[in-house]
């Protein structure tokens, strides 16, 4: 997820395409939109966005704030009901990439959470990935 997005920001010249699965696209919005019961644990893991210096750092490393550096086609996969990474993380990176004129495919399974567990969604996802890679590799 996040590592794919970060790799696309920093190493687009070495990649042909990228597939982001339930990735954090902006740490500040991720922490803001994470459910209350998980937020404090995520702050320990990633940093506390309420601290101005940490907030600035989190904004700086967030792929959504660096889409101009992404030059590879991107496939973004998300589950609408993801309790770990809010769907807004996928929606905002897709919107930013599209607004910047970048190539982006988006698959949001409305009946899934963090990853695709249902066979019909896994099958559709795998077919979409094959098409994406055939087109961009």
Where do the model's predicted regions map?
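Active-site-proximal cap/loop segments of hydrolase catalytic domains
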Residues: 1-137
């Amino acid at each position: 997820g996040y590592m794919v997005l970060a790799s696309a920001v920093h190493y687009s010249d070495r990649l042909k395409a990228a597939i982001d699965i339930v990735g954090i696209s902006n740490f500040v919005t991720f922490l803001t939109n994470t459910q209350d019961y998980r937020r404090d644990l995520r702050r320990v893991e990633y940093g506390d966005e309420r601290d101005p210096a940490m907030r600035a750092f989190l904004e700086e490393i967030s792929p959504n704030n660096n889409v101009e550096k992404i030059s590879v086609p991107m496939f973004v996969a998300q589950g609408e009901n993801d309790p770990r990474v809010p769907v807004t993380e996928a929606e905002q990176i897709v919107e930013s990439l599209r607004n910047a004129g970048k190539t982006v495919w988006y698959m949001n399974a409305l009946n899934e959470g963090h990853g695709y567990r249902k066979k019909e969604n896994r099958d559709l996802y795998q077919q979409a990935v094959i098409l994406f890679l055939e087109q961009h590799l």
